[in-house]
Regions:
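Conserved DHp (HisKA) dimerization/phosphotransfer helix of two-component histidine kinases, i.e.
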Residues: 1-39
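Detector for a conserved hydrophobic position within an alpha-helical segment of the HATPase_c
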Residues: 145-146
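Short alpha-helical Gxxx[C/S/T] motif in the catalytic ATP-binding
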Residues: 137, 141
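Short beta-strand-loop-beta element adjacent to the nucleotide/active-site pocket used for signaling
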Residues: 82, 87-105
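Short conserved segment of the HATPase_c
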Residues: 101-102, 114-125
Length: 172
């Protein structure tokens, strides 16, 4: 089982780093969400347009944010609001390395919150709060963010869940 999980969680292709604009990535996630959940799901954005581009794998970053946002939309039954927000961070330590400049990406929703029973284990493989869920979405998101030397964390209560992704803009 351990071997199978490792194969499922390992990217099927090598990381392809290119210069990417985080807002283009978030807009792609936004368009995918609105197509998948047409109707009463609102996806708001609050972007810091002064953020520089970063070097990363575009597809991995899209998948990481999409997994988080899709979980939120599913938890809300396709209704409610998801907000995507970016900010710059200065002089921050990520994964034991110090960076002069990083970016903070928040995926926020007004859904039911993450159940207490899974909150401490939500990034583990096969942990899902949804009937029929694979329990791999957040694990994959965490792996992809870590591939980019970033961090991911979550604060959740009923009516307000925030996933915060911090990514370095420049190499350590």
């Amino acid at each position: 089982l351990q071997d199978l999980m490792q194969r499922l969680l390992t990217p099927h292709r090598a990381m392809l780093p290119t210069t990417v604009n985080i807002h283009e990535i978030l807009e792609r996630v936004r368009s995918l969400l609105t197509a998948e959940f047409p109707g009463s799901l609102a996806v708001r954005r609050d972007y810091d347009t002064s953020l520089p581009e970063l070097v990363g794998d575009r597809e991995q970053l899209i998948q990481a944010v999409l997994n988080i946002a899709r979980n939120a939309a599913q938890a809300m039954g396709g209704e409610g609001e998801i907000a995507l927000r970016t900010r710059s961070l200065r002089q921050v330590t990520l994964a034991k390395k110090r960076y002069r400049l990083a970016m903070e990406i928040k995926v926020m929703d007004n859904g039911p919150g993450i159940p207490d029973a899974i909150r401490e284990r939500m990034f583990y493989p096969l942990v899902s709060g949804r009937e029929g869920g694979s329990g791999l979405g957040l694990t994959i998101a965490q792996n992809f963010i870590q591939h980019h030397h970033g961090t991911i964390n979550c604060v959740s209560r009923p009516g307000h869940t925030v996933f915060t992704l911090n990514l370095p803009v420049e190499q350590a």
